[in-house]
C-alpha cells in the first residue's frame, strides 16, 4: 500500500509538471482555470507524508479538492517506577504505526455580489496500531507482558455556509450549519508471559451538530452591532467489554472498577450581542455579552446511574484599543470562556495498560470557566516587529490529569476538576530583519501558576514559576534558497502531583526552489541532537513515582513540492497524531 501511494504521488508530480508546461505555452491563448500542488515527504525509516491540493476557478464559483495521507512508525521507550505499598519497576517498549487518509471537498459559489455560498465535506480515516512490550518487576515477581491495540476511526463532516451582503463589512447576515459523525473501533489483546490474559472490544459513535445565525449592522455614527444565536449539540454512545481467560493473573481483572460504557448528551443554546465603535482618531472600544444555557445528560451503563446538569452562564467581553500611529497599537482585552471536557476525558471505561496500571476517564467532569485579562502591545516597523502580551488567567474548576494509588500498588490515570487555577504570564515575540536575506525571531514566555483543589484526598496544590523560549533563524536568497533553524526550550514545570523536567530540541531545514520556485526540494532534520525527552517525578510525600519516556524524534526528511498555475496554498485536511493528555507517558 505504501509503495503504491508513493508511485501515485510521483505520477501526479510528473503529470502536473507536464500540465504546467503546457499551460505556460497556452497562457497567452486562454487562462487555465486549474491550479494545484503535489507534495511528498519521506524520511529514512520508511515513513512518508503526502498531499494533493487541486483548485478549479470560474467567474462565479470555485472548487477545491484536498488529499492528505501519512504513514509512519513511532518508537517510544518508557520507564515507570512506583513505591506505595510496594516497589514496582517497569520497562516499556512501544511501537505505533499511524496510517491516515483525509479528503476534503469545498465549493464556493458567488451567484451575485451580495450572496455567498460555501459547502464543505471532509472524510478522515486514521488507523493506529500499537504494540507494547512490558517488563514488570516487583520485589517478589517478574512478568513479561505484551499489549496490542488496533484503533481505527471513520469521520465524515459536512458544513454549509451562506452570507447575504447588504453592504460589505457594514450590513451582513450569515447562516452556518455543521454536522459531524465519527465511528471508533478499539479491539485489543493482552498477554502475560506469552499466555493470553484478556481481550477487549470497544466502539464509540460521537456526533455533533452546530447551527448558527449572525447579524451585523452599522449605524450612522459608524458604531457596529453584532448579534446572533447558536445551537450546539453533541452526543456519544460508548460500549466497551473485557473478556478474561483461565490464565488471568491473580484474578486481577475481576477486581477492576469496570464500566461497560456511557450515554452522553449535551445541548447548548447560545445568544450573543456586542457593540463596537471607533472613538475619535486613536481609540476603539468593543463591549459584548455571550450567554449559554447548557443541558447535560449522562448515563453510566454499568450501574444505570444518571447524572444531569442544567447550567446558565454569562460570558462578558471587553476590548479597548489605542492606536497612536500606523506602527503602534496598545489594547486591553477581557474575556470569559468555557472549555468542555472531551470524550477521552469523560469515558469511564477502565483501560488496562498492564495489570497494575490503568487509564479511566471521569464522566462527572464539569466545564472549566476561564476569566482572562490581558494587555497587548504591537510595534511594527520596516525591519522589526515586537509583540508583547501581559495576561492574568483565572480558571474555575480547571480540568487536570490525576494519578490514583490503591493499597495493592495499582495505579490509575484519570481526570478531575480542581478548585481554582490562576496564572500570571508575559509573552514577548520579536522579529527582526537586519538584512534583506536574514530574519531573526526570538520569543519567550514567562508564567507563574498557582492552583488548589482536592480529589479523593489528593492535594492538587501548585505554586510554580516556569518559562519557555524559541529562537528561529531564517535565511533567504534571491535564488529561491531558504534555510531555517529552530531551537526550543521548556524549563522545569510543576503540575498537580508532579514536577516535569526541562525539555529542549533543535530543528534544521533547507529548501531550494526550481523553475521559478514552482518545484521545491527540501531537506530537514528534526531534533538534531536527539535531546527531546519526557521526565516526570512525583512531588508528594505519600508515594514515590518517576516516569521517563523517549520518543524517536530524531529523523531526516526529504520533500518534493510542485505548484502549478500560481496555486495559493490552503490548509489541508490532515489528521494529526493523538494529543498527549496525561502527565504519565507510557506510549499511550
Q: Where are the language model's segments positioned?
A:
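Extracytoplasmic loops and strand-loop junctions of Gram-negative outer membrane beta-barrel proteins
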Residues: 34-37, 84-91, 139-146, 157, ...
Amino acid at each position: 500500500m505504501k509503495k503504491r501511494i508513493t508511485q501515485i504521488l510521483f505520477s501526479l508530480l510528473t503529470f502536473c509538471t507536464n500540465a504546467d508546461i503546457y499551460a505556460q505555452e497556452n497562457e497567452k491563448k486562454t487562462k487555465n482555470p486549474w491550479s494545484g500542488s503535489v507534495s511528498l515527504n519521506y524520511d529514512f525509516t520508511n515513513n512518508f507524508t503526502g498531499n494533493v491540493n487541486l483548485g478549479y476557478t470560474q467567474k462565479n464559483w470555485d472548487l477545491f479538492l484536498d488529499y492528505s495521507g501519512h504513514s509512519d512508525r513511532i518508537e517510544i521507550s518508557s520507564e515507570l517506577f512506583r513505591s506505595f505499598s510496594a516497589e514496582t519497576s517497569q520497562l516499556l517498549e512501544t511501537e505505533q504505526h499511524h496510517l491516515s487518509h483525509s479528503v476534503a471537498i469545498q465549493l464556493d459559489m458567488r451567484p451575485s455580489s451580495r450572496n455567498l455560498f460555501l459547502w464543505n465535506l471532509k472524510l478522515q480515516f486514521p488507523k493506529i496500531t500499537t504494540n507494547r512490550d512490558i517488563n514488570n518487576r516487583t520485589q517478589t515477581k517478574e512478568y513479561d507482558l505484551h499489549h496490542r491495540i488496533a484503533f481505527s476511526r471513520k469521520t465524515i463532516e459536512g458544513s454549509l455556509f451562506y452570507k447575504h451582503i447588504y453592504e460589505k463589512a457594514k450590513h451582513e447576515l450569515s447562516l452556518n450549519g455543521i454536522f459531524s459523525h465519527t465511528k471508533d473501533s478499539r479491539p485489543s489483546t493482552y498477554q502475560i508471559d506469552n499466555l493470553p490474559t484478556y481481550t477487549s472490544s470497544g466502539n464509540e459513535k460521537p456526533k455533533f451538530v452546530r447551527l448558527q445565525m449572525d447579524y451585523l449592522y452599522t449605524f450612522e455614527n459608524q458604531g457596529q452591532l453584532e448579534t446572533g444565536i447558536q445551537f450546539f449539540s453533541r452526543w456519544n454512545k460508548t460500549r466497551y467489554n473485557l473478556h478474561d481467560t483461565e490464565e488471568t493473573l491473580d484474578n486481577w481483572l475481576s477486581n477492576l472498577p469496570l464500566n461497560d460504557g456511557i450515554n452522553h448528551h449535551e445541548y447548548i443554546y447560545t445568544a450573543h450581542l456586542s457593540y463596537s465603535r471607533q472613538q475619535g482618531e486613536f481609540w476603539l472600544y468593543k463591549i459584548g455579552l455571550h450567554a449559554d444555557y447548557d443541558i447535560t445528560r449522562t448515563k453510566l451503563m454499568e450501574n444505570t446511574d444518571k447524572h444531569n446538569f442544567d447550567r446558565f452562564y454569562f460570558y462578558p467581553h471587553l476590548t479597548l484599543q489605542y492606536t497612536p500611529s500606523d506602527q503602534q497599537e496598545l489594547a486591553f482585552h477581557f474575556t470569559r470562556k468555557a472549555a468542555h471536557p472531551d470524550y477521552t476525558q469523560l469515558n469511564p471505561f477502565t483501560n488496562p495498560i498492564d495489570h497494575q496500571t490503568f487509564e479511566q476517564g471521569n464522566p462527572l467532569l464539569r466545564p472549566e470557566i476561564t476569566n482572562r485579562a490581558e494587555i497587548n502591545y504591537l510595534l511594527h516597523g520596516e525591519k522589526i516587529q515586537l509583540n508583547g502580551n501581559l495576561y492574568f488567567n483565572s480558571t474555575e474548576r480547571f480540568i487536570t490529569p490525576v494519578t490514583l494509588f490503591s493499597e495493592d500498588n495499582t495505579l490509575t490515570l484519570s481526570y478531575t476538576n480542581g478548585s481554582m487555577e490562576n496564572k500570571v504570564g508575559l509573552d514577548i515575540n520579536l522579529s527582526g530583519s537586519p538584512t534583506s536575506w536574514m530574519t531573526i525571531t526570538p520569543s519567550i514566555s514567562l508564567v507563574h501558576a498557582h492552583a488548589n483543589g482536592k480529589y479523593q484526598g489528593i492535594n492538587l496544590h501548585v505554586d510554580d514559576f516556569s518559562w519557555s523560549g524559541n529562537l528561529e533563524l531564517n535565511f533567504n536568497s534571491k535564488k529561491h534558497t531558504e534555510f531555517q533553524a529552530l531551537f526550543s526550550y521548556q524549563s522545569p514545570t510543576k503540575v498537580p502531583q508532579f514536577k516535569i523536567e526541562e525539555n529542549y530540541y533543535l530543528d534544521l531545514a533547507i529548501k531550494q526552489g526550481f523553475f521559478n520556485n514552482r518545484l521545491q526540494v527540501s531537506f530537514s532534520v528534526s531534533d538534531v541532537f536527539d535531546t527531546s525527552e519526557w521526565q516526570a517525578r512525583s512531588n508528594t510525600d505519600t508515594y514515590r513515582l518517576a516516569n521517563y519516556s523517549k520518543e524517536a524524534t530524531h529523523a531526516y526528511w526529504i520533500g518534493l513540492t510542485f505548484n502549478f498555475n500560481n496555486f495559493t496554498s490552503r490548509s489541508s485536511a490532515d489528521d494529526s497524531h493523538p494529543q498527549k493528555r496525561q502527565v504519565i507517558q507510557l506510549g499511550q
